[in-house]
């Protein structure tokens, strides 16, 4: 009897110790995932509403009278229409993103001739609708092209997009978004230039096509110095919010900010008015 009681007591002790060890172990976050789905088919393997249950997802493109074009697209979740995209496009990409915390998002893009994006961003299911929460497109300062490259880490997303900048020509930029306050928010108004195709291949510099005013910060309006025509300019990074955009530059030993060029200021598609030999081509 004593041996039986001892074994029972030992078993209880081991069980309690196991519970204690388990309770202090850190909870391992799930690995974030990204899946590509195709329009015209019903998908039943993914949660898009955020309730942890698999949903029925279908994206239906609207036919156009023109070959190779679509008049828009409708998104259905569990047989209910939850989103209408009213843009004409030729090709469409759909990606489902699930963060480490289980929160799902859609990355949608529609493209036309020359890979120009007409809609491109992150979408989230809210109150029975799928709505855009991040817009990758800013047509004020450039023509957006190609599909974004997305890098996942926990509840953070790094997004690299390509555009034909009216200041700098073909470039790749990067922003970081983090899950906060129930959605994905950009972590900073400062973005990175990953690639600048029009920069001098040997020096990495741009040549000023005219005198350009530089400012001390992107918000103060305080003048710093003037970049002289034909001098070399190194592009560092950029700042943007709303419809404002400034580019951080280095000219000799001086660093400052210049206003980015808009489409109207670019004189159509003639080339950048700020820098020499910058054409709006791939």
Regions found by a protein language model. Name each.
Residues 2-13:
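Bacterial N-terminal signal peptides that target proteins for export
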């Amino acid at each position: 009897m004593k041996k039986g009681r001892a074994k029972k007591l030992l078993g209880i002790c081991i069980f309690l110790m196991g519970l204690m060890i388990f309770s202090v172990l850190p909870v391992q976050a799930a690995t974030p995932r990204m899946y590509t789905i195709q329009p015209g088919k019903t998908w039943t393997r993914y949660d898009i509403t955020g309730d942890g249950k698999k949903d029925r997802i279908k994206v239906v493109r609207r036919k156009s009278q023109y070959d190779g074009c679509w008049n828009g697209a409708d998104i259905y979740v569990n047989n209910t229409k939850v989103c209408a995209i009213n843009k004409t496009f030729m090709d469409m990409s759909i990606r489902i993103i699930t963060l480490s915390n289980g929160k799902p998002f859609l990355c949608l893009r529609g493209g036309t001739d020359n890979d120009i994006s007409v809609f491109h961003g992150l979408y989230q299911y809210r109150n029975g609708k799928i709505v855009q929460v991040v817009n990758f497109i800013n047509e004020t300062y450039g023509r957006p092209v190609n599909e974004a490259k997305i890098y996942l880490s926990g509840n953070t997303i790094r997004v690299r997009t390509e555009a034909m900048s009216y200041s700098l020509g073909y470039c790749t930029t990067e922003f970081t978004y983090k899950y906060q306050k129930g959605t994905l928010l950009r972590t900073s108004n400062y973005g990175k230039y990953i690639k600048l195709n029009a920069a001098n291949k040997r020096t990495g510099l741009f040549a000023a096509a005219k005198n350009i005013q530089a400012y001390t910060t992107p918000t103060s309006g305080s003048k710093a110095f003037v970049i002289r025509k034909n001098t070399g300019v190194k592009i560092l990074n950029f700042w943007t919010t709303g419809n404002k955009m400034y580019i951080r530059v280095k000219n000799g030993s001086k660093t400052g900010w210049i206003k980015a060029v808009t489409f109207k200021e670019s004189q159509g598609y003639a080339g950048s008015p700020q820098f020499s030999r910058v054409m709006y081509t791939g």
